[in-house]
Amino acid sequence: MVVALGLDFGTSGARAIACDFDSDRSVSVSVTFPKTSQNWPQVWREALWQLLTQIPADWRSRIERIAIDGTSGTVLLCDREGQPQTEPLLYNQACPIDLADLADWVPADHAALSSTSSLAKLWFWQQQFGALPPDWQILAQADWLSLQLHGCSQQSDYHNALKLGYSPDRERFSKNLLDSELGALLPVVHEPGVAIGPILPAIAQEFGLSPDCQICAGTTDSIAAFLASGAHQPGEAVTSLGSTIVLKLLSQVAVSDRLTGVYSHKLGGYWLTGGASNCGGATLRQFFPDTELESLSCQIDPTKKSGLDYYPLPSRGERFPIADPDRLPQLEPRPENPVQFLQGLLEGLTQVETLGYQRLQDLGATPLKRIWTAGGGAKNAVWQQLRQQAIGVPIAIAPNTEAAFGTARLAAFGLAAFHSAGLKRT
């Protein structure tokens, strides 16, 4: 029986799920990060060792493949042995650079043309240091953690490498970037799930793991959550109804739109495209605690319209499906009846999701066929009915949404379920 281990490193903690896919059995453990740290690599490494220690010994000894997912855009510089030479720059840290400086290295619509991208952070470090030693390397969070297990320098996957300037359709970095002073620091890029190498003997012995256990190329946390859902057909999508609304659609065609933050990740023979609105559960919680949301939702008749026309932003600014940094919340008029008010908010959020999928299809993505729902809002049956009425495709709660489970699935099976005849790009 093959056991695969998926490790998910998020912003507030880490989780590990070991899965025996032959018997549908699994074991899960987790750790929480401190809110702040002066040494994030040490926090991550200690969390990695804690997770391995917490997995029962009889499970550990049967693990044959391991993969790690991490936060997209969180990167650090280290030497070839993996010793950090800088503090990491986190996913949401913008770098004060001129994006025009990156224009010769990536296409005009590339996801790396952002002040928070990994490439922007590498260029920022180059400006800060004056010159970077050619025997250093830039690694994403997941890459660096994998290095602790396999010991192979400069290894990444094409999901984490996208924001570093990697072009998945061409399967390479541009010649201009490779020939630049940054080229020596770039990683070798693998398909997610491909084995990079065996676990280091000392690590295997310390934690009671098989010396034949393979460490595989990883992915990002958001893609791992998509993999956990089981969606694998073009036209299938996952909507995450959390503090914000995040859409991910499996498409036969890659689409992009820098204005609204839409870009596409290669996923085997398909593309995973999507966008994220600022609207979501954060707006609902401004007005209702969770218990009240549940009780009021039960009183809504979804077959009758509220008559309200809201755009429920939590504060100024929207990014997708409408790019408008000055857009204000539209939450008036507010009726005295809280049931009607909540219905108006849910209808507004539903409209945002509807417009989002329409925007992806306007850009040329594969038509939407089915939605799997993740996040706290997935449990709201009335909201689901409103969404199904508006969007017009089957909607169901995703059977699994744990990123660590998706990464365990990636370690076990790679991207075999996503390979098709060919890739297209608009």
UniProtKB/Swiss-Prot annotation:
Recorded GO CC terms: cytosol
Keywords (A to Z) from UniProt: ATP-binding, Kinase, Nucleotide-binding, Transferase
Any one biological process term the GO annotation gives: xylulose metabolic process
Residues at which substrate binds: D8, S12, G13, A14, R15, S72, D221
Transferase found in the keyword field: yes
Pfam families attached to this UniProt entry: FGGY_C
UniProt-annotated binding residues for ATP: S243, G281, G376, G377, A378, K379, N380
Catalytic activity: D-ribulose + ATP = D-ribulose 5-phosphate + ADP + H(+)
UniProt-listed Enzyme Commission number(s): 2.7.1.47
Function, in words: Exhibits ATP hydrolysis without substrate. Phosphorylates D-ribulose.
Record protein name field: D-ribulose kinase
Organism of derivation: Synechococcus elongatus (strain ATCC 33912 / PCC 7942 / FACHB-805)
